[in-house]
UniProtKB/Swiss-Prot annotation:
This is Diaminopimelate epimerase. Gene3D superfamilies: Diaminopimelate Epimerase, Chain A, domain 1. NCBIfam families: DapF. It catalyses: (2S,6S)-2,6-diaminopimelate = meso-2,6-diaminopimelate. Keywords: Amino-acid biosynthesis, Cytoplasm, Isomerase, Lysine biosynthesis. It comes from Brachyspira hyodysenteriae (strain ATCC 49526 / WA1).
Length: 279
């Protein structure tokens, strides 16, 4: 079977996008082929696969699969690319655009340049702060500065769900963090029944932070939109940051705004290349 695809990225968070309006590629196919096609040495290379599909509830639907084939509820960087692809390719010319996800229907405001989408602001919806609903095994709301011990050192995390679980850890020196070891330990800790994403954050000032990301099922990535949204919420509810922040991720910058119990994320969406691969 020959499969046409488009490689795109949002702040370096790169996925293989499949237009299921044209391609006969199913959810089961995505689960099977994501570990194969996402391999950076033997295939296309990406953080995973995102399907762009018809929706009877919104303008378009997205389904997102991690590097290991597991499915996630939402991807903040991915949804910006879905909006760009759908608008640029004429699937939907609505602005704002409604996109169906496993988290629900989210709205994307499109900012154009030369008649194509340049940047996208996503209404990421309300964060979930109830411990058992994130989910964690901790019956507390909210979970702020919760201690956890790794290699005889205590770290403190704030738990937030943006449709997928996040553990946000504020640190003094982001550069020298052992992201792989700590991230893997946190991801698979029994505190998180569905595993978790982990964000390591260094505060520059109340309106500016730096972030590194350990994504559930993918490992360290250059960016995570839901993670950046969780960082915005965690920083604000813990009193560390204001409700509007500039977040510097390894793959680029995002602007986050937390107001009226909703998180808004604005950033770029970019094409990498297109191709056809034989499965």
């Amino acid at each position: 079977m020959d499969l046409s695809f488009t490689k795109m990225h949002g702040t370096g968070n790169d996925y293989i996008y499949i237009n299921c309006f044209k391609e006969k590629f199913t959810v089961e196919d995505a689960i099977k082929y994501s570990p194969i096609l996402s391999h950076r040495h033997y295939s296309i290379g990406a953080d995973g696969i995102i399907l762009i599909m018809p929706s009877d509830k919104a303008d378009v639907q997205m389904r997102m699969f991690n590097y290991d084939g597991s499915e996630s509820e939402m991807c903040g960087n991915g949804i910006r690319c879905v909006a760009k692809y759908a608008y640029d390719r004429g699937i939907s010319k609505n602005n704002p655009m409604k996109i169906e996800t496993l988290r629900g229907i989210l709205e994307a405001e499109l900012f154009l340049k030369d008649e194509e989408v340049d940047t996208v602001e996503i209404s990421m919806s309300s964060p979930i702060l109830e411990g058992l609903k994130i989910p964690t095994t901790i019956d507390k709301t909210p979970i702020i500065n919760e201690p956890i011990i790794f290699n005889d050192k205590t770290y403190y995390f704030t738990a937030v769900s943006m449709g997928n679980p996040h553990a946000v850890i504020f640190v003094n020196d982001l550069h020298n963090m052992d992201i792989s070891s700590i991230g893997s330990y946190m991801e698979n800790n029994s505190i998180f029944p569905n595993r978790t994403n982990v964000e390591f954050v260094e505060i520059i000032n109340r309106g500016e932070v730096k972030q590194r990301t350990w994504e559930r099922g993918s490992g360290e990535t250059l960016a995570c939109g839901t993670g950046a949204s969780a960082v915005c919420v965690a920083g604000f509810i813990s009193g560390r940051t204001d409700n509007i922040i500039l977040n510097h991720l390894l793959g680029g910058d995002l602007i986050l705004r937390y107001e009226n119990d909703n998180v808004f994320m604005k950033g770029e969406a970019r094409y990498c290349f297109e191709g056809t691969i034989t499965l």
